[in-house]
């Protein structure tokens, strides 16, 4: 019933906005509207994510490590158990200073901490806990790379997560383990390395590749991420397109 009602409303609208190309295609198929009447406008990113915010205490605490930073909610949808195992695999393959810094909380945190103990992860992972959104740039500034991961679900691939936009705003390389629109955005941006959702071996190889990459090449990835944010996710640009 809900879909029938929503489809009816969609068909009556003069124009529709989809947050990604996959959603645009779905709306076109459900409504029969021409492509010109279904615009693609991504979710914007708040401007403060684009401002570097060095924190001397954080930098001192995590100095000497290759910091792979994840920010946000920890649920089964993020497949962080697979990520943790990929990080340990990469460390065993030579990325000995690789460090997974998890900033956030959620229903999966206790299970992840138990898994870390079971796998003897030790100092390979830090569970930092939740911080206010305005504090997140302190962690993205610290990061050598920023991690986004999603489980293998068709619905999760329909949109580009807002987190990816905030990562690109930070101007750091992105390590993505996901399918769909987010995967395609990372590939198109040239600002990071992307592997299919839940592919532990592929994620491990991308972690090793980024770890071994010259610093100048990693900086170039970050610059491309920033440029993609400016063109696609900056609030002022999206409001202009509206």
Would you name each region that the model predicts?
Residues 22, 41-44:
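Carbohydrate-associated surface elements
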Residues 65, 103, 110-137:
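Nucleotide-activated donor-binding/catalytic signature segment of Leloir-type glycosyltransferases, i.e.
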Residues 28-29, 36, 44-60, 79:
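Acidic anion/phosphate-binding donor-loop and adjacent secondary structure
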Residues 188-189, 193-200, 209-215:
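Conserved acidic donor-binding segment of nucleotide-sugar-dependent glycosyltransferases
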Residues 29, 209, 216-232:
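A short, well-ordered alpha-helix in the C-terminal region of glycosyltransferases
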Residues 1-16:
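Membrane-proximal helix-turn-helix segments that form the acceptor-binding/catalytic region
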Residues 59-88, 101:
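Conserved donor-binding/catalytic core segment of Leloir-type glycosyltransferases
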Residues 145-148, 166-177:
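Short hydrophobic beta-strand element within catalytic cores of glycosyltransferases
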């Amino acid at each position: 019933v809900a879909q029938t009602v929503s489809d009816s409303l969609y068909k009556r609208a003069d124009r529709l906005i989809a947050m990604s190309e996959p959603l645009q295609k779905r709306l076109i198929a459900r409504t029969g509207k021409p492509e010109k009447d279904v615009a693609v406008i991504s979710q914007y990113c708040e401007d403060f994510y684009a401002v570097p915010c060095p924190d001397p205490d954080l930098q001192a605490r995590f100095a000497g490590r290759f910091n792979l930073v994840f920010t946000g909610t920890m649920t089964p949808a993020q497949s962080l158990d697979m990520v943790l195992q990929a990080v340990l695999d990469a460390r065993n393959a030579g990325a000995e200073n690789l460090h997974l810094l998890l900033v956030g909380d959620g229903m999966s945190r206790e299970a992840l901490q138990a898994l870390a103990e079971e796998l003897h992860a030790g100092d390979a992972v830090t569970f930092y806990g939740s911080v206010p959104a305005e504090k997140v740039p302190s962690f993205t500034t610290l990061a050598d790379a920023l991690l986004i991961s999603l489980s293998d679900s068709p619905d999760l691939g329909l949109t580009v997560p807002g987190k990816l936009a905030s990562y690109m705003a930070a101007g750091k390389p992105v390590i993505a383990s996901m399918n769909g629109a987010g995967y395609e955005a990372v590939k198109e941006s040239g600002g990071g390395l992307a592997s299919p959702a839940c592919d532990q071996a592929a994620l491990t190889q991308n972690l090793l590749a980024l770890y071994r990459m010259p610093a100048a090449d990693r900086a170039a990835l970050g610059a491309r991420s920033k440029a993609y944010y400016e063109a696609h996710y900056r609030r002022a640009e999206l409001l202009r397109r509206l």
